[in-house]
Each structure stands twice: as C-alpha cells, then as structure tokens.
Amino acid sequence: VETPISKVQGASPTSPMVDQTVSTVDVVTATYPTGGYNGIYIQTPGSGGTPKKATDASDGIFVYSTWAAAHVKVGDCVTVKGTVREYHDLTEIGGSTQVDRKSGCAPVKATELATLPATDAGREAYEGMLVKPTSGYTITNNYGLNQYGQIGLADGNTPRYQGTEVALPGRGAEAVEVANKAK
C-alpha cells in the first residue's frame, strides 16, 4: 500500500508516522551524493505550483539513502520504501531504505513564493518541497553552507546583522535584534 508524502509529513512539525515503514511513489527533486547529506528529496507527482496554508501538510520529504543519491537523478520517478523518522527537526525516510526507478509519474512544479513564510508552521508546509522565490533576497548567513548546504536569506537587499555588528552591546544591539525578528 502506497502512503502519500502528505500523510507521512502530517500537518505538525513531527510526523504522525514516526517509526513506521512506508512505501511511496514520487518524483526526485534533488540529489545529494556528496557533502554529508547522502540522500535525495522527493515530491508527490503533479504537486506544487500552488501556495500552501500553514495548516497544510508538505508534499516533499528527504530520503536518506547513499545508494539513491548516487544512482537516481532529478526528474526520475521512484518507489521508496523505508522507515519514517525525525532527524534534527526534519522528517525523513531512512533505515534500510529501498529505492527503485519506475515510470509514469507526473512532473512536479516549483511553488513560486514572493516572500518566504516567517513562521515555523508556514515553513513546515513546504518542508522538502521545490520552491521558487520570486522577489529579491539577500544572503545573510552562510555559516552552514559547506557542511549542510544551507544559506540564510533575508527579504529585500539588506542582510540581517547581529545586533553587536552594528551597535554596542546593550539597548542598541537589542533594538537591532528586535527589528530582525519583526522581518
């Protein structure tokens, strides 16, 4: 029995299916054969393109599989069987994961977003999904780039500064941090 990714993800930060074995048929949207990820992202065929509400479940998920990362490519239709788990606040399918190529999946679309969701719940609705920012963003943090492939983005053309980068410790720095949280 196939389980849709949205059911695996659920509408809360933690999957309702943790420690359960699932099988799902989806489209590969990213592969990470090097750099420590050792896996792929998959998304429900035909999904994407429409913005989600914070209460919606995501249609994408990470699959921890060294074999898959080296043998499938973006756009492939795959059957994935493995165990649902949470890893550093990320829902993934892992364990003794089985990934097989197949045919017949409708392509996925990137969901265009003028602004990225500001809340954890808003971002959770897009966890693991293909998104396409459509407005201007500035890289504001690259600390996790080499290890995790992550960059921090800020809306507009101004990076977010740490309070003490632009003000002395105390009220001035605190005001900068308050302004950052409001963005």
Where are these regions (language model features)?
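Extended non-catalytic accessory segments flanking core domains
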Residues: 1-183
